[in-house]
């Protein structure tokens, strides 16, 4: 019988894993060499450093991480010892895509993408400034999807005429105040740069394209067509979705450094849902203070769980590394982990790990009324399923509970299709 040591915070796994062998469940960050000495399999998450210190002298034949990321695994050591490993590519990609899209909806409602000259067209259907409601003119929202009437359908031919697709450089105020900004609460026509186009970046690109965004894909190792220079020149928002790497021409450690932000010409919102160390915390704070960006959306942090208090205060959305924490993504990761074990040992075992159903009338935290009147119903429906401001409020109230908030994350679902 197989002996498995399993991170006790991996959801939906206990009953299913018992079909594979004898299971021991332990806190991921507390798993020791003694714990795994007699184990055949280690199933973990990113909080367990899988290396020589942990595995030397053990019987472990297979390491599985129930995550997309795998920089916590010393793969060179595992290869040296002939220990196999698997991750769960794409398991929570749609969850991260949901996080990015919903964060951009909130940024749009806050006025982060608005300029006075960009919020009206020639027939003077314009948005009011400050915290006032939209103008009462019934043309303020279009009848088909509740989008802002100032927009036109998104096509390659007319993208350049959309409110968010103008290519001129706009001077930023160092003290952007969303309460005094004109706004256009739509994602249609935004140009969004995605850095890192693996499973997650691809899912983000797809969900934003469905909202009418123009997407610039930047991933030099994959031969994607756009560069960081292109994104700096054209993107209204930039979202990081790379692994963390330290060597080579395309190393991603501090990819978003001071020079990255200095080169931005029109970017309003910066998002890090990759790894914390892909962005230099001091550089992000500088960019906010100097008006190089208007808002930061930070899900991954340097030095987790001991995160920057100043960036926590300054970010528009600040969450404890939970962008991929939908129940759907977790269920996918658990299923893929168990299937990897079964395949490795030649076991005839298949796993169906359904995500829990939502209760009737489910709402993932209420939106402020100052935002709800700025958003179309389609956006509000998405935000009822997941509102990242709720996670932000929770983290700001108790940043010392970073790990507990991850380990005891509330029920969240992706779109129910």
Predicted regions and their residues:
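Rossmann-like adenosine-cofactor binding region
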Residues: 50-51, 221-309
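Phosphate/diphosphate ligand-binding glycine-rich loop within oxidoreductases
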Residues: 41-110, 170
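Phosphate-binding beta-alpha-beta segment of Rossmann-like dinucleotide-binding domains, i.e.
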Residues: 83-116, 155, 166-195, 199, ...
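N-terminal glycine-/charge-rich "phosphate-binding" loop or analogous flexible N-terminal tail
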Residues: 1-39
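Oxidoreductase and adenylate-handling cofactor-binding alpha/beta cores
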Residues: 97-110, 210-213, 335-344
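NAD(P)-binding Rossmann-fold cofactor-contacting core
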Residues: 11, 210-226
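Rossmann-like dinucleotide-binding domain for NAD(H)/NADP(H)
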Residues: 267-269, 273-417
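Long, intrinsically disordered low-complexity tandem-repeat segments
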Residues: 113-148
């Amino acid at each position: 019988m197989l002996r498995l040591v399993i991170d006790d915070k991996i959801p939906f796994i206990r009953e299913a894993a018992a079909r594979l062998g004898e299971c021991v469940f332990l806190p991921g960050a507390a798993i020791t060499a003694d714990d795994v000495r007699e184990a055949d399999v280690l199933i973990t998450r990113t909080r367990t450093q899988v290396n020589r210190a942990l595995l030397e002298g053990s019987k472990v034949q297979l390491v599985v991480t129930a995550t997309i990321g795998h920089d916590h695994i010393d793969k060179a050591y595992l290869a040296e010892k002939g220990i196999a490993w698997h991750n769960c590519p794409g398991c929570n990609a749609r969850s991260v895509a949901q996080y990015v899209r919903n964060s951009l909806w909130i940024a749009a409602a806050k006025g982060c993408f608005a300029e006075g000259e960009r919020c009206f067209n020639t027939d003077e259907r314009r948005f009011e400034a400050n915290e006032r409601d939209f103008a009462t003119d019934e043309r303020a929202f279009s009848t088909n999807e509740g989008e802002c009437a100032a927009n036109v359908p998104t096509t390659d031919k007319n993208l350049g005429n959309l409110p968010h697709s103008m290519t001129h450089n706009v001077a930023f105020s160092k003290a952007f105040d969303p309460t005094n900004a004109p706004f256009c609460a739509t994602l249609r026509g935004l140009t969004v740069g995605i850095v890192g186009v693996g499973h997650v970046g691809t899912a983000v690109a797809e969900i934003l394209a469905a909202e009418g965004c123009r997407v610039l894909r930047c991933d030099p190792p994959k031969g994607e067509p756009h560069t960081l220079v292109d994104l700096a020149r054209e993107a209204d928002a930039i979202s990081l979705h790379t692994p963390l790497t330290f060597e080579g021409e395309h190393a991603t450690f501090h990819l978003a450094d001071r020079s990255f932000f200095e080169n931005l010409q029109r970017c309003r919102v910066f998002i890090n849902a990759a790894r914390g160390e892909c962005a230099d915390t001091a550089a992000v704070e500088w960019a906010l203070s100097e008006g190089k960006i208007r808002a930061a959306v930070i899900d991954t942090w340097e030095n987790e769980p001991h995160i920057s208090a100043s960036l926590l205060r300054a970010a528009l959305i600040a969450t404890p590394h939970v962008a991929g924490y939908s129940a759907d993504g977790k269920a996918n990761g658990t299923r893929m982990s168990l299937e990897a074990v079964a395949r490795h040992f030649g076991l005839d075992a298949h796993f169906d790990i359904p995500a829990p159903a939502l209760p009737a009338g489910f709402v993932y935290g209420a939106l402020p009324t100052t935002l709800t009147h700025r958003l179309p119903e389609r956006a509000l429906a998405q935000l009822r399923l997941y509102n990242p401001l709720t996670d932000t409020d929770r983290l700001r109230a108790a940043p010392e509970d970073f790990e507990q908030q991850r380990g005891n994350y509330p029920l969240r679902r992706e779109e129910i299709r």
